[in-house]
Each structure stands twice: as C-alpha cells, then as structure tokens.
C-alpha cells in the first residue's frame, strides 16, 4: 500500500504550499576562504521554505510559496530565481519596508559557519494578516520549517494560523523542526515545537532533533513518542547514516550512500520536499525511504542549493536505479514480525 492510505480523508490532488522566509546566501567559491578574507562569492537563494519549494518543483510537484519580501534588488533576485525554478510566487507579499535577510557562509574544519544579517528582515515580519485562507484551502499539503517559530511573534502567529486554516480545509500539514543553533532552544521554544509537531500529519526531524523533542535516546521509543503526538508519517534523517521512515506500524531504514560531500546546505529541506512528493505519488514506504535518501544525498554533492545542487526527478531516479540506495524493514526487538503492522 502507498502512503496516501495513511490519510484517507486528505485531498487526492493539489499543490504543495510552503510558508517561510526567503534569504540570500553568499557562498565562497573556495572552501578555504574565510569571512575575514577578500575573495569571490556566489549569490544563491536560501531560506528553508525557498529551498523546499524549489526542490518540490524540481521533483515534479506543483508548489507555491507564502512569504514576504521587499522591493530591494536582493528581494527581486530571490523571487525571480524561485519563480524560474517553477514555484508559484504570486502569493508572496511585496512590502515597501525592509529587505530580505542575508547570510554569509564559510567552511571550517569543524563544519559550516554562517554570519546572518536577518534581524527584523522583511521576511520575518510576515503575519497572520498576510494569509489568504482561500489559497491555503486549495493546497494538498502545507509545509512549515520550525525555525520560523523562534524568529518573532509575527511570523510565529502566521504559522499557527496557517495550520488552523489547513485543518479547517483538509490540507495535510508537514513540519520540519529545523532546530537551529543560532536560535533559542528549550523552555517555551520547545513547547512551541511540540505544539506544532502535534498538529502535523507529516513530521521530519533529524535524529538529534527527534531526541531533543522526545527526551529519548532509543529510536523505537522516539518513534513511539513522535507518533503518539499525532503524525501518521515520521521520517528521521540521519546525515551520512541515511534515513528512517515510520508509518502504519512499519519502520524502514535506508542506509547512507557513500558519496563525496561537498556542501550539505539545503539537504534537510530537500529531503522534506521529497517526503511530501512521495505522499503525492503514493509511494510504498520502502520506495519513499530510498527516494528521500537519494534526494538528500545528491544535494550534498554540490555547492549551494537553489539553482545549483537541487536534483531533478530524473537524477534521483537514476541514483535509485543504480543499486547504491537500499531500504530494509526494521523489526522491533522482542516483537514478532507478523505482529508489527504491514501499514503503508
């Protein structure tokens, strides 16, 4: 059975709608170039919702973006780039006040380092009043990245209002906690993440995020807690170790694929887009695990994300057919295989 069987009352067709902030990344052309040094950089569109929506479009989905930009050159560049990627930007609000956030990247031996210039960015000032319920109602899936919940009250309120609209109209809710180190975590922030996760139909944390959300270490306990919150489909991305997908009593693992990692920017957002696309295509759980794993892997092999590293549907299918990407069903310790549901 395919993933659509998890959501019997969901709309059979429709677009994927992403809510969030567009950013512009300045990516160095050399991995040894530091922010304190002169050198050449490439401008590329970023922001979780921007990367997600472009990835969904590249994978064959009809996808739209909800957000707010300014009328500055950086905003125009971001919107035009996303639109050229096949995303419907007609519902992006154009504001006379402010510009989109900027991020400058450097590659350090211990990982990536971002210098953000996004405080009070126009994108973070998207509000519930900027939402059009008719637009949300027409979607099949609404996707939100969790880091929006910690930017400010304005966009946080928009996120929860958009979910309320989605629930009123039978729109599936996809949520990626996207917990960022530069934002606060714990206390009220954790409660907001848990509140949003409990309203999601599709949940995609990393393993570290799943542990933070649940307070558990064992993966079976983690899945029990996450499903207990409400999501029917849970996908846990594990960086180089691949991914786990859980639904309908089944758990499938797709091990990591050995490739040279150039830049992991956007891999999680593209993985989330792939997961939503798998639901649209009604893939069986094992095929979905392989598909998502392949998408996340391919993104890591190139620098940048939008217009540079996001793979096409054909590229993903080619990697799936190569035999390098596997998936296997996992059986809970101490449970008979026949007792562990067949599910999706």
Residue spans for each PLM region:
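Active-site metal-binding loops of divalent metal-dependent hydrolases
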Residues: 20-22, 147, 177, 270
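Short, conserved phosphate/pyrophosphate- and ester-handling motifs at nucleotide-, phospho-/glycolipid
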Residues: 56, 206, 268
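Glycine-centered short loops/turns at secondary-structure junctions
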Residues: 60, 86, 168-170, 230, ...
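Structural alpha-helical scaffold elements that stabilize or flank donor/cofactor-binding regions
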Residues: 134-135, 195-196, 227
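Conserved beta-alpha-beta core of the PfkB/ribokinase-like small-molecule kinase fold
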Residues: 141, 147-224, 241-243
């Amino acid at each position: 059975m395919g993933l659509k069987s998890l959501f019997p009352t969901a709309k059979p067709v429709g677009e994927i709608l992403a809510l969030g902030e567009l950013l512009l990344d300045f990516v160095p052309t050399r991995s040894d170039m530091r922010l304190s040094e002169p050198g050449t950089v490439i401008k590329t569109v970023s922001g979780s919702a921007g990367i997600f929506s472009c990835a969904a479009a590249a994978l064959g989905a009809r996808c739209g973006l909800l957000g707010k930009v300014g009328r500055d050159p950086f905003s125009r560049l971001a919107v035009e780039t996303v639109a050229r990627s096949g995303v419907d930007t007609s519902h992006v609000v154009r504001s006379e006040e402010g510009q989109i956030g900027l991020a400058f990247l450097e590659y350090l031996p211990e990982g990536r380092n971002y210098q953000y210039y996004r405080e009070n960015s126009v994108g973070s000032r998207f509000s519930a009043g900027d939402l059009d319920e008719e637009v949300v109602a027409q979607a099949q899936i609404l996707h939100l990245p969790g880091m929006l919940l910690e930017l400010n009250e304005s966009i946080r309120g928009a996120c929860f209002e958009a979910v309320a609209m989605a629930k009123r109209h039978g729109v599936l809710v996809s949520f990626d906690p996207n917990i960022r180190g530069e934002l606060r975590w714990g206390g009220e922030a954790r409660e907001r993440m848990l509140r949003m996760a409990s309203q999601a139909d599709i949940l995609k944390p990393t393993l570290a995020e799943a542990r933070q959300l649940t307070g558990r270490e064992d993966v079976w306990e983690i899945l029990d807690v996450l499903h207990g919150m409400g999501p029917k489909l849970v996908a846990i991305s594990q960086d180089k170790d691949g991914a786990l997908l859980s639904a309908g009593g089944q758990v499938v693992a797709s091990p990591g694929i050995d490739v040279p990692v150039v830049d992991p920017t956007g891999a999680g957002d593209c993985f989330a887009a792939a997961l939503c696309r798998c639901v649209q295509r009604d893939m069986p759980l094992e095929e979905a695990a392989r598909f998502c794993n392949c998408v996340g892997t391919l993104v890591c092999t190139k620098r940048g994300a939008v217009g540079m590293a996001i793979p096409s549907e054909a590229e993903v299918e080619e990697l799936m057919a190569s035999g390098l990407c596997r998936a296997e069903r996992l059986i809970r310790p101490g449970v008979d295989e026949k007792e562990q549901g067949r599910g999706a």
